[in-house]
Amino acid sequence: MTVILYSRPGCHLCEDARAMLVRAGAAFEERDIEADDVLFRRYLERIPVIVIDGEETFELVVDEAALRARLGTFAGS
């Protein structure tokens, strides 16, 4: 499973999404949209965006239970 978190510095929702991925034990790559003009234009108003296996699965506010279900992980695992 490939998981990518699109974020930017100073984004509190991005920090929350990152923490959820860590708590879920997910291996993920984080990409700073400010480092790429194309990503910046695409995701500026939508971050955080979590892409799982090529599908934009979550954006803006991430529900932790839904994220864990999509990743196949559960609280306490």
Q: Each PLM stretch: what is its role?
A:
Residues 1-24:
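Local sequence-structure signature of Cys/Sec-based thiol-disulfide redox active-site neighborhoods
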Residues 6, 31, 59:
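Small/polar loops that bind or transfer phosphate-bearing groups
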Residues 8, 13, 39-42, 48, ...:
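Accessory recognition modules or surfaces
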Residues 27-37, 44:
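Thiol-based oxidoreductase modules, predominantly thioredoxin-like and allied folds used
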Residues 48-56:
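A short, hydrophobic beta-strand/beta-hairpin element that forms part of a small beta-sheet core
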Residues 55-77:
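Non-catalytic, surface beta->alpha helical segment in thiol-disulfide oxidoreductase systems
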